[in-house]
């Protein structure tokens, strides 16, 4: 008779699985709570201490850490010396292990949990058994996922080592992710920002039709502990499944909308905001965002930091949009937008924006870049007027608004704006004056009337950008400064009667 060891914290489906094993002529060995559940259900089951001949100790910390368990798991069945050692020590082989681990992740997500309580949910015996069984996959089945119960029962008659190897790989991924969560939890408590080893845990969320292009395979993984303010935490109410590009654009859009406490609407296209509006109401903000670039908004992503009302929903309904994401939708507004079959409607709690991930990562060939997200906001008190003319209070407000937007635009980045409304966005040009021209041409083509203000994510290397801006209606400029030719730009601004302020903080976005 073969033997199976079952020890699970989540008992879902375990009785039926054990009954299937008994029907396949397995003896069942079990521990603690799992033993009680199986025994109560009428499953023939042997308590673990009858196998180890040693009682549980240290409040259950030591139950399965015993040679009678690990010897039975690790012995190579085709190695005579291994089998002789088992016989000498009266150890019987164990042919299947079914374990899911103490709920460490669920425990640390509870706000009232102390570190001592969390530590008690670090499983030791479970991962040890999983690793022993997985190492010996040629002979042992190792089951960590309830979704595999039925398939494992079906595979028992096949004796397929390929399937056991599949289960073993899954078990090692499972224990690696579990250990990574523990390491991350303790590192956070120890305030370690950049550890010597970095292990990040992500769970499969959904398959994607394709990646950026149709010939690229893709999937979406969410952090094992996703922040409350993230696309992974958003709830989809309506529409088709998200695409790879949808997810990236929506992520970019919510970051801009979260910059502002006032009602804000962001139109995002290809990872760049094409229109941003602030207003006294969300509809007012929508009108400004739409007017900023009514062409590029087609097929875009809309993020709003207030509930979508009926008036705004009616306006959105008139356009082809990929996604609308907001804290909520008024019932009548939702009914209006749900008439469009393909639009994706999502909700996200913008009040949790302060809890967004502190760090961001970018993969490169052979490595991973990790940095703090650019969360700093330039304040009025930090601005240094470097020209003879100082900006007016209205201009200063418009400059700070534009500066909050420009840090979300691909470098070289320029934003032309008035108070609470972008008018033109120049993104991703290889020279700064090129972005200036694009932003201003867009503002003027949309029929916007000067005066405007201009924000730059980095310094002007020459005075040509300042000259062009001044000649096309710009009255005030905000930029970090820091060029060896800053004085040339200052002189040009003075010559043209433009005010300019320095922030001493760059906002590159590559």
Swiss-Prot record:
User: What's in the keyword line of the UniProt record?
Assistant: Hydrolase, Multifunctional enzyme, Purine biosynthesis, Transferase
The MGS-like domain covers which part of the protein? Answer: 1-144
Q: Would you say which domain of life the source belongs to? A: Bacteria
The record, for SMART domains, names:
AICARFT_IMPCHas, MGS
EC number(s): the record gives 2.1.2.3, 3.5.4.10
Q: GO cellular component terms?
A: cytosol
| Pathway entry | Purine metabolism; IMP biosynthesis via de novo pathway; 5-formamido-1-(5-phospho-D-ribosyl)imidazole-4-carboxamide from 5-amino-1-(5-phospho-D-ribosyl)imidazole-4-carboxamide (10-formyl THF route): step 1/1; Purine metabolism; IMP biosynthesis via de novo pathway; IMP from 5-formamido-1-(5-phospho-D-ribosyl)imidazole-4-carboxamide: step 1/1
Gene Ontology biological process: 'de novo' IMP biosynthetic process
Q: Does the keyword Transferase apply?
A: yes
Q: Which Gene3D superfamilies match?
A: 3.40.140.20, Methylglyoxal synthase-like domain (3.40.50.1380)
GO MF = IMP cyclohydrolase activity; phosphoribosylaminoimidazolecarboxamide formyltransferase activity
- For this protein, what reaction is catalysed? (6R)-10-formyltetrahydrofolate + 5-amino-1-(5-phospho-beta-D-ribosyl)imidazole-4-carboxamide = 5-formamido-1-(5-phospho-D-ribosyl)imidazole-4-carboxamide + (6S)-5,6,7,8-tetrahydrofolate; IMP + H2O = 5-formamido-1-(5-phospho-D-ribosyl)imidazole-4-carboxamide
* Matches recorded under Pfam families: AICARFT_IMPCHas, MGS
Q: What is known of its domains?
A: The IMP cyclohydrolase activity resides in the N-terminal region.
Annotated family: Belongs to the PurH family.
Protein's name according to its UniProt entry: Bifunctional purine biosynthesis protein PurH
> Source species, please?
Latilactobacillus sakei subsp. sakei (strain 23K) (Lactobacillus sakei subsp. sakei)
The organism's taxonomic lineage, starting at the top: Bacteria, Bacillati, Bacillota, Bacilli, Lactobacillales
């Amino acid at each position: 008779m073969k033997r199976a060891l079952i020890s699970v914290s989540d008992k879902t489906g375990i009785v039926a699985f054990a009954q299937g094993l008994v029907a396949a002529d397995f003896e069942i060995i079990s521990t603690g709570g799992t033993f009680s559940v199986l025994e109560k259900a009428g499953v023939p089951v042997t308590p673990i201490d009858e196998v180890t001949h040693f009682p549980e100790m240290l409040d259950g910390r030591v139950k399965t850490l015993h040679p009678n368990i690990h010897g039975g798991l690790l012995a190579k069945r085709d190695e005579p010396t291994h089998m002789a050692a088992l016989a000498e020590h009266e150890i019987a082989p164990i042919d299947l292990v079914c374990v899911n681990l103490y709920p460490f992740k669920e425990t640390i997500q509870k706000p009232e949990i102390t570190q001592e309580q969390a530590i008690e949910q670090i499983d030791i015996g479970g991962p040890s058994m999983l690793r022993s069984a997985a190492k010996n996959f040629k002979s042992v089945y190792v089951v960590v996922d309830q979704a595999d119960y039925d398939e494992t029962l079906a595979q028992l008659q096949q004796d397929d080592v390929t399937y056991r190897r599949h289960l073993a790989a899954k078990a090692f991924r499972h224990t690696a992710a579990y250990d990574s969560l523990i390491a991350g939890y303790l590192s956070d408590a120890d305030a370690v920002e950049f550890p010597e080893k970095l292990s990040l845990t992500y769970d499969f969320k959904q398959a994607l039709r394709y990646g950026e292009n149709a010939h690229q395979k893709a999937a979406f993984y969410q952090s094992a502990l996703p922040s409350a303010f993230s696309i992974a935490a958003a709830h989809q109410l309506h529409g088709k499944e998200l695409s790879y590009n949808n997810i990236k654009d929506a992520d970019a859009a919510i970051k801009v909308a979260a910059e502002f406490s006032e009602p804000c609407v962001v139109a995002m296209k290809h990872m760049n905001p094409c229109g941003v509006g602030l207003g006294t109401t969300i509809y007012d903000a929508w009108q400004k965002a739409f007017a900023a670039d009514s062409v590029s908004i087609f097929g875009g992503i809309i993020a709003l930091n207030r509930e979508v009302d009926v008036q705004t929903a009616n306006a959105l309904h008139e356009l082809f949009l990929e996604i609308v994401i907001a804290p909520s939708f008024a019932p009548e507004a939702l009914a209006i937008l749900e008439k469009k079959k393909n639009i994706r409607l999502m909700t996200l709690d913008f009040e949790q924006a302060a809890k967004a991930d502190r760090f961001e990562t970018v993969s490169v060939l052979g490595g991973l870049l990790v940095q703090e997200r650019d969360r700093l906001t330039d304040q009025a008190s930090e601005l240094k007027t470097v020209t003879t003319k100082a900006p007016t209070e209205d201009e200063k407000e418009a400059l700070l608004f534009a500066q909050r937007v420009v840090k979300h635009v691909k470098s070289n980045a320029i934003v032309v704006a008035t108070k609470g409304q972008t008018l033109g966005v120049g993104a991703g040009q290889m020279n700064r004056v090129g972005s200036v021209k694009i932003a201003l041409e867009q503002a003027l083509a949309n029929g916007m009337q000067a005066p405007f203000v201009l924000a730059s994510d980095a310094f002007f290397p020459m005075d040509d950008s300042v000259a062009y801006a001044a000649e096309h209606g710009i009255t005030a400029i905000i930029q970090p400064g820091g060029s060896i030719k800053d004085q040339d730009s200052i002189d040009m601004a003075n010559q043209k009667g433009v005010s300019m302020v320095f922030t001493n903080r760059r906002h590159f976005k590559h």
